[in-house]
From Swiss-Prot:
Protein name: Small ribosomal subunit protein uS8
GO BP, one annotated term: translation
Complex formation: Part of the 30S ribosomal subunit. Contacts proteins S5 and S12.
HAMAP family: Ribosomal_uS8_B
Gene3D superfamilies membership: 3.30.1370.30, 3.30.1490.10
UniProt GO molecular function: rRNA binding; structural constituent of ribosome
Organism listed in the record: Vibrio atlanticus (strain LGP32) (Vibrio splendidus (strain Mel32))
One Gene Ontology cellular component: ribosome
Xref: InterPro entries: Ribosomal_uS8 (IPR000630), Ribosomal_uS8_CS (IPR047863), Ribosomal_uS8_sf (IPR035987)
Length: 130
């Protein structure tokens, strides 16, 4: 069975891993998943990530907890294969009044909504993280 939406699968694995208090979760790797993991690490939502470059590359994301509670309270896919969501620089959303981030795919690469607003770029809204 082929996977229709690998990004949704990644977000679901992270969500389920934190619900089960796992230390880390593994998933098939891709350039976009690695870029999302790098952004989550830079924003402080995960501890670390690593790519095992074997026959089938695998991405391992080390999850982050604070006082035994998951740091990621909510992670939600926005733009999906059946309904792509694009926003220009003026209509980029703020997540939880600025406490969360929106992952935006721009012409300059993947970045948070704050960084995209600062750079004056719009793009595809991949997901919300809070």
């Amino acid at each position: 069975m082929s996977m229709q939406d690998p990004i949704s699968d990644m977000l679901t694995r992270v969500r389920n891993g934190q619900a089960a208090n796992k230390v880390a979760v593994k998933m098939p790797s891709s350039k976009l998943k690695v870029a999302i993991a790098a952004l989550l690490k830079a924003e402080g939502y995960i501890v670390d990530f690593a790519v095992d470059s074997e026959a089938k590359p695998e991405l391992e994301v080390t999850l982050k907890y604070f006082q035994a509670k998951p740091v990621i309270e909510q992670i939600k896919r926005v733009s999906r294969p059946g309904l792509r969501v694009y926003k220009n620089k003026d209509s980029l959303p703020t997540v939880m009044g600025g406490l969360g981030i929106a992952v935006v795919s721009t012409s300059k690469g993947l970045m948070s909504d704050r960084a995209a607003r600062k750079a004056g770029l719009g793009g595809e809204i991949i997901c919300y993280v809070a």
